[in-house]
Amino acid sequence: MSEKYVVTWDMLQIHARKLAQRLLPVEQWKGIIAVSRGGLVPGALLARELGIRHVDTVCISSYDHNNQRELKVLKKAEGDGEGFIVVDDLVDTGGTAQAIREIYPKAHFVTIFAKPAGQPLVDDYIVDIPQDTWIEQPWDMGVVFVPPICEGR
């Protein structure tokens, strides 16, 4: 990955609220299935904005910090996804999204961010991201003190 796209907590909440507006009316949904771990925070934000209390998870492992690795389904919510929103933070190459589509063929699959290779696999997303860009999510970062330039002389 050559570029990095840094996401702040404020940006994430704004994007999640935009996505929630597109998911109205709320009465059409039975619940949310968040893809662990990237979809956990967006799932919580959507649950709050839509007033949805039924939240479950599907646990799929495909990343090890900066590297993609073999896909493993560790745990899944029951059913075919009918009436459920499945949410992840992003769709990248489409590997995880393809697995989600196979597990939950009737779900409405959404992400906050989408890269070109994975876009066709989601029903909706908010932000386009170039394929060669790594997304730094706010839960993966910490705030640190940076001394003024004049002190580094």
Curated annotation (Swiss-Prot):
Q: What reaction does this catalyse?
A: GMP + diphosphate = guanine + 5-phospho-alpha-D-ribose 1-diphosphate; XMP + diphosphate = xanthine + 5-phospho-alpha-D-ribose 1-diphosphate; IMP + diphosphate = hypoxanthine + 5-phospho-alpha-D-ribose 1-diphosphate
Q: Which GO terms describe its biological process?
A: GMP salvage; IMP salvage; purine ribonucleoside salvage; XMP salvage
Q: Where in the cell is it found?
A: Cell inner membrane
UniProt topology in membrane: Peripheral membrane protein
Q: Where does guanine bind?
A: D92, I135
**What GO molecular-function term can you cite, just one?**
xanthine phosphoribosyltransferase activity
Tell me its EC number(s), please.
2.4.2.-, 2.4.2.22
Name of this protein: Xanthine-guanine phosphoribosyltransferase
List the source organism: Photorhabdus laumondii subsp. laumondii (strain DSM 15139 / CIP 105565 / TT01)
